[in-house]
């Protein structure tokens, strides 16, 4: 609407009037300020300035709280530096003690301290039962000492587990025993071929060991007497019968006498009767 009115206003002016309007800056500024777009921009600017002012005033209200928090942060940072320095000192001391003491030593010291605090709490309980300590002081001191005793007991158990694990570790990493050398397979004994002819060779009999000496005061047994008298013969000599001859082999020699059977010779038997030749078609009964 404003743009259309300005165009209609400029359309009714002559060229000379337009040139004069261009040269008159005050009139141009007044015309621009009267435009609707310029008025809207000015209104938005004023509203934005008012909003920023209110926000700035609200932020200024937080200035004391911000200063307090800054001072607190500075104080906490200084405390952190102090604690960090104390941590470094304790860590250095702990490393020095850990390098000079073993787990077993620490466990023994901790067990001694645990036994001491247990004894102190028991003595305090006995004094309270005897009426030597008031109730208020007994509750405060006894509770703190029992808490300390419980913490030491837990530390002792954890340290015992660490010691046990430290003792089992070398056993788990112990070298394995050396393996026994494997025996080389023995060569098979040579056996005679099955095609070999002739009787098997007789192996000589092993001589039995001599009998133990008979102590004094005891009679010798017949076996001991026979063995000590001469050559050890475990059984009397007998004349053995000759081996029966084999087909295709000569009779073995070397026996002094022929074997005589103690039984009479068998009676001669009659030959079986002769049967007629077999005829086809008949069954013999």
UniProtKB/Swiss-Prot annotation:
Regions of compositional bias (Polar residues) in chain numbering: 250-260
Gene3D superfamilies hit by this protein: Helix hairpin bin
Cross-referenced SUPFAM superfamilies: Endosomal sorting complex assembly domain
GO BP annotations, alphabetical order: macroautophagy; membrane fission; multivesicular body assembly; positive regulation of viral budding via host ESCRT complex; protein targeting to membrane; protein targeting to vacuole; protein transport to vacuole involved in ubiquitin-dependent protein catabolic process via the multivesicular body sorting pathway; ubiquitin-dependent protein catabolic process via the multivesicular body sorting pathway
Location(s) in or outside the cell: Late endosome membrane
Region Interaction with IST1: start-end pairs: 50-170
Tissues with expression: Widely expressed. Expressed in macrophages and lymphocytes.
Pro residues bias (residue ranges): 262-279
Family to which the UniProt record says this protein belongs: Belongs to the VPS37 family.
Name the record gives this protein: Vacuolar protein sorting-associated protein 37B
Name of the gene this protein is made from: VPS37B
């Amino acid at each position: 609407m404003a743009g259309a009115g300005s165009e209609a206003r400029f359309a009714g002016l002559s060229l000379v009037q337009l040139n004069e309007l261009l040269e008159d800056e005050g009139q141009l500024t007044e015309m621009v300020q009267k435009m609707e777009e310029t008025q809207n921009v000015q209104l938005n600017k004023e509203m934005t300035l008012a909003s920023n002012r209110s926000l700035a005033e609200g932020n200024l209200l937080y200035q004391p709280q911000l200063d307090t928090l800054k001072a607190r942060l500075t104080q906490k940072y200084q405390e952190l530096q102090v604690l960090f320095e104390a941590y470094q000192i304790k860590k250095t001391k702990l490393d020095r003690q850990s390098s000079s003491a073993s787990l077993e030593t620490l466990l023994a010291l901790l067990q001694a301290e645990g036994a001491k605090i247990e004894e102190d709490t028991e003595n305090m309980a006995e004094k309270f039962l005897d009426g030597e300590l008031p109730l208020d002081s007994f509750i405060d001191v006894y509770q703190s000492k029992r808490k300390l005793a419980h913490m030491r007991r837990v530390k002792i158990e954890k340290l015992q587990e660490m010691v046990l694990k430290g003792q089992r570790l070398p056993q788990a990493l112990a070298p394995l025993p050396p393996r026994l050398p494997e025996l080389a397979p023995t060569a098979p004994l040579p056996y005679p071929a099955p095609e070999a002819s002739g009787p098997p060779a007789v192996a000589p009999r092993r001589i039995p060991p001599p009998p133990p000496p008979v102590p004094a005061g005891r009679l010798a047994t017949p076996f001991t007497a026979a063995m000590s008298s001469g050559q050890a013969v475990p059984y009397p000599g007998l004349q053995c019968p000759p081996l029966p001859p084999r087909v295709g082999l000569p009779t073995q020699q070397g026996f002094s006498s022929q074997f005589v059977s103690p039984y009479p010779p068998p009676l001669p038997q009659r030959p079986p009767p002769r049967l007629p030749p077999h005829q086809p078609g008949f069954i013999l009964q």
